[in-house]
From Swiss-Prot:
This is Pyridoxine/pyridoxamine 5'-phosphate oxidase. Transmembrane segments: none annotated. Catalyzes the oxidation of either pyridoxine 5'-phosphate (PNP) or pyridoxamine 5'-phosphate (PMP) into pyridoxal 5'-phosphate (PLP). InterPro entries: Pyridox_Oxase (IPR000659), Pyridox_Oxase_CS (IPR019740), Pyridox_Oxase_N (IPR011576), Pyridoxamine_oxidase_dimer_C (IPR019576), Split_barrel_FMN-bd (IPR012349). GO terms for molecular function: FMN binding; pyridoxamine phosphate oxidase activity. Homodimer. Its EC number is 1.4.3.5. Pathway: Cofactor metabolism; pyridoxal 5'-phosphate salvage; pyridoxal 5'-phosphate from pyridoxamine 5'-phosphate: step 1/1; Cofactor metabolism; pyridoxal 5'-phosphate salvage; pyridoxal 5'-phosphate from pyridoxine 5'-phosphate: step 1/1. FMN binds at residues 74-79, 89-90, 95-96, 153-154, 197, 207. SUPFAM superfamilies: FMN-binding split barrel (SSF50475). NCBIfam families: pdxH, PRK05679.1. Belongs to the pyridoxamine 5'-phosphate oxidase family. PANTHER family: PYRIDOXINE-5'-PHOSPHATE OXIDASE (PTHR10851:SF0), PYRIDOXINE-5-PHOSPHATE OXIDASE (PTHR10851).
Length: 225
């Protein structure tokens, strides 16, 4: 017995989704044109995404795994990157924060649709220093700083009014200088694996994988699409 409002596998809606296709012909990714250092390759592609005015080029999917071995994903914003790793900021008490506390390994993915490119990054995660978190928090707009106090991220709340009331309370309490909440700060993922994907015609996509064999020493390999 089918639930009303749910489409069966043979429904017209399902068929139309199955027929959606795109031919990727914008660019290619060869070993000779790619950097030996994956961080340089990432920097080049990110800058090209910014230059191409890709919407939210800094948005990345973060995948974590909890103690129950169930994976979960969400979109966060990259806030910095260098030879130490990829940085983002969040509520440490959120679902992702709790999962990273128990299992400090994660995966990131950037998908720049307009450029037909994907970057996947895997590695170990650690908190950034308090000084780094303090500096970034102080640079945020006032409303965002108050929001970090107002939102008990990932907790069940009775309605949006809870957030509005909390924002008003903390806004009055801190006026113009809210300090960083102790439950809020940055994470840094130290990559040990990168993959760069460039869409190609006939589904024969380019995939270059970088594996860290020893600290700072990368092996670049081509993967079958």
């Amino acid at each position: 017995m089918h639930n009303r409002g749910m489409s069966s596998p043979s429904s017209p809606l399902s068929s139309s989704i199955a027929d959606l296709r795109k031919s990727y012909e914008r660019a290619e990714l060869g070993e000779e044109a790619s950097h030996a250092d994956p961080l340089r390759q990432f920097d080049q592609w990110l800058q090209e995404a910014v230059a191409a005015q890709v919407p939210e080029p800094n948005a990345m999917t973060l995948a974590t795994v909890g103690a129950d071995l169930r994976p979960s994903t969400r979109v966060v914003l990259i806030k910095g990157y260098d030879e130490r790793g990829i940085v983002w900021y969040t509520n440490y008490g959120s679902r992702k924060g709790r999962q990273l506390a128990g299992n400090p390994f994660a995966a990131l993915q950037f998908h720049w649709v307009e450029l037909e490119r994907v970057v996947r990054i895997e590695g170990r995660v650690e908190k950034v220093s308090d000084a780094e978190s303090d500096a970034y928090f102080a640079s945020r707009p006032l409303d965002s700083r108050i929001g970090a106090w107002a939102s008990p991220q990932s907790e069940v709340i009775s309605g949006r009014g809870v957030l509005v009331a909390n924002a008003a309370k903390y806004g009055a309490q801190f006026l113009l200088q809210p300090l960083r909440p102790p439950h809020w700060g940055g994470f840094r993922l130290k990559p040990d694996r990168w993959e760069f994907w460039q869409g190609r015609k006939s589904r024969l996509h380019d995939r270059l994988c970088y594996r860290e064999e020893t600290p700072g020493a990368w092996v670049r390999e081509r993967l079958a699409p």
